[in-house]
Curated annotation (Swiss-Prot):
InterPro entries: EAL_dom, EAL_sf. The keyword Isomerase does not apply. Belongs to the YdiV family. Residues 1-237 form the EAL domain. The gene is ydiV. This is Anti-FlhC(2)FlhD(4) factor YdiV. The lineage of its organism: Bacteria, Pseudomonadati, Pseudomonadota, Gammaproteobacteria, Enterobacterales. Pfam families: EAL (PF00563).
Amino acid sequence: MIASLDELYHSELFFLPVMDENARLVGLEIIATFAAEDGAVRMPTELVAPRLSVEEQYCLFVEKLALLETCQHFFIQHKLIAWLNLPPAISDLLLLDSELFSRAARFPFFEVAINENYPGLNQGKNNETLANLAMHFPLILANFGAGEASTKAIFDGLFKRVMLDKNFIQQRAEMISFEPFMHAIVAQISSSCESLMIAGIDTEAMFARAAPLGFSAFQGGLWPPVPVSQLIKLVQR
């Protein structure tokens, strides 16, 4: 996809691994970076997303689905989950555009990721769009702890999975209370979702600290994103 910002940028898609406590692959998040046409500048999606039009956000989501389609046998063969972040601006389109809905719903391993800044998230199941999304797709709250939402939507049972925010984890990791605080979160949240995951695992030392705490999966710089050409290497370790 080509995005028109101060200059033209094109999207490049990568797979961000999610591992279990034994460092075995359980799923992949499809993420995007944006590169200038001359390749001299690269920006992550979170910096570019606020400047994308609704049409550009739609095109990027479709581009991710197309990549997922080319890799679907890999996901099925290795029993992996695929996560795609859904921008709020196109959440209604996913439900109302029959072609887009069909493309997404055909993958049994596909789950929709949303962030804490999703409009009306604190309304929980009273948010009609969010409730409808949860009826049709497994949802994951991708950055719990970012500080932009309450726990209502989690306790309403809208999310199959919850991922703790990487910045939240890295800030807490510096505190002596990190382990008991994580135990408290696991105890509080686990009964309201199928899987509680943790991001911000950038080192072996951090992985060793987090692995015994009761989380089902881990994500971070310890397992960097890979292009589609290197997917097979993730299951050969």
